[in-house]
Amino acid sequence: MDPFEGRMTFLQLLGKLNASQFSQIKPAQFAIKHLDLEEDLYSCIWEELESGSFNTRVNIMYFVDTLCEMCLKNGLTGGYLNMISRDICKLVQNVAPIGAAGAANAPEVRKVLQSLHEKKVIDDNQYKDAMATVEAHEQASKSGDTSTSGAISKNDILKRIEEDRERHKRMRENIWAISEPELEAEIAWNTTQGITESDLESLKDEYEKFNECLHATS
C-alpha cells in the first residue's frame, strides 16, 4: 500500500472513532499492519486531532491508549510508542486545551495518562509533566480564561453523554473479566499431582469427623 492510500484509509477509520471498542481496535490494527507507513499514519492522528471536535479529540486520546496496548501485546517497541511518549504533553494540550472543551475532557485525559503510565509507555517525569499540564489548563478554565476555546454545541454535549455511557459500560465489563492466570499459579497447577487413594482416605476421615461434631451439637 502506498503512503497516499494508507493515509486516506487511516483517516477514514479515525473519522469513525467513537466510544465503542470496535471503532478503536480497527484503526489500531491497521496502524500495526502497516508499520512501514508509521510516520505517515502518525501524522494522520495529528491531522484528525487538530481539526476535530472536543468529542473527536477525547476519542483520539483513547485510541492512542488502544494503539499502545496493541503494540505492547504484539511485542512492538519503538515506532508508535516512542512518538507518543515524545509528544505526550503536546497531545494533552490539544485534547484538554484551556476552556470549556478542555475542562470537559480533562477527567478522561487523566484516565488515559494513568493507563499509559501503568503500561510504561510514558515514564514518571513525562507522566508528571502531562498531569501538570492538565491541571494548569483546568485551573485556567475555571478562572475564566477561555480565549483559546470554542463553544460546545448541544449536539456535542448529547454525544458525549452517550459515549460516556458506553465507556462506563465497558469499564464495568472489564472489572468482571477473568484475567489470564499468573505464571506462578499456572506452574503450581501443572505440577500438582492428581488425587491419590491416600488423599481420598484422608477426605473420608475428615468427613466422618465433621459428621460426629455435627451430631454432638444437635
UniProtKB/Swiss-Prot annotation:
PROSITE patterns in alphabetical order: CID
Compositionally biased intervals (Polar residues): 141-152
Chain ranges of the CID domain: 2-138
InterPro entries: CID_dom, Ctk3, Ctk3_C, Ctk3_N, ENTH_VHS
UniProt keywords, alphabetically: Cytoplasm, mRNA processing, Nucleus, Transcription
GO CC annotation: CTDK-1 complex; cytosol; nucleus
Compartment(s) where it occurs, according to its Swiss-Prot or TrEMBL record: Cytoplasm; Nucleus
A Pfam family: CTK3_C
Region (Disordered): 137-157
GO molecular function annotation: calcium ion binding
GO biological-process terms attached to the record: mRNA processing; positive regulation of DNA-templated transcription, elongation; positive regulation of transcription by RNA polymerase I; positive regulation of transcription by RNA polymerase II; positive regulation of transcription elongation by RNA polymerase II
Self-association and partners: CTDK-I consists of three subunits, ctk1/lsk1, ctk2/lsc1 and ctk3 (also called alpha, beta and gamma).
Known function: Subunit of the CTDK-I complex, which hyperphosphorylates the C-terminal heptapeptide repeat domain (CTD) of the largest RNA polymerase II subunit. As part of the CTDK-I complex, involved in RNA polymerase II transcriptional elongation and pre-mRNA 3'-end processing. Together with ctk2, required for ctk1/lsk1 CTD kinase activation.
UniProt-listed PANTHER family: CTD KINASE SUBUNIT GAMMA (PTHR28291:SF1)
Family statement: Belongs to the CTK3 family.
Protein name (Swiss-Prot/TrEMBL): CTD kinase subunit gamma
Species lineage: Eukaryota, Fungi, Dikarya, Ascomycota, Taphrinomycotina
Gene: ctk3
